[in-house]
Amino acid sequence: MIVLKITSIGADISDNDTSCSRELIASLEASIPGLLDAGAESAALTNITGDDVVISAFVEDDMLETVNRAIVEILRDSSESLGDLEGISDEPDGAGEGISYAEAAVRQDRYPDAVILAFDTYGGEDFVADVANSAIAAARGMDGVTDVSQEIRPGVREIPGVGYVSDKTDDPVVAATIEDIESVGVAAGAMLGAALGHKNVHLVRRGSPSYVIPGSVIVSATAFLNGNLIDLAVPFEERTRILRVL
């Protein structure tokens, strides 16, 4: 049986430590259609978080490695600085601080819908792994969630079709596939609540620079729904306002 998956690859390829230039974003977005030629069913620049970007694609399992390689090539061709791309190795022994990766399966009879969280640190704050894992744990087993990407663990990680990266990778990506459109808000709310419950974690809009006090983590949240993007920071900012009753 052919399994449809979401694959999300994040990287710091900016020439500064706080933001992504308009030129970088435009170059990446112009290259996204090439992923459809490589075998993706849909693809997008889903998250822009500080100086990190995430490209995501829905792809059949037998084309996963090909599409992953194509994503990395787009990142490489558009990069202002090779940054995280330099940490990729063909062998585990050579793995360094590299790209981030998340993968989750889509149920066969469902629309390809997912929630993607992307984190950025200014100084490689090591507690970001705990923050990401809290979001993963919150989504796992929820009604309305099909699958969640694997936890951030110590040790070298293999990215299908790309190579190996070390556990020094410090800007994780989390992806969760959703059963139905009504569950998007519930799943995203649980994931964001778990992440934001940690100290010094801030929700930002897609494309925001990391203008925070060092020692902090920022997170962006995107719904990737049947090929369409929704920046979830906007509705959640409104939904979490205190209701004034006096």
Swiss-Prot record:
InterPro entries, per database record: UCP005278
Protein name: Uncharacterized protein MTH_564
Similarity field: To M.jannaschii MJ1676.
Recorded superkingdom: Archaea
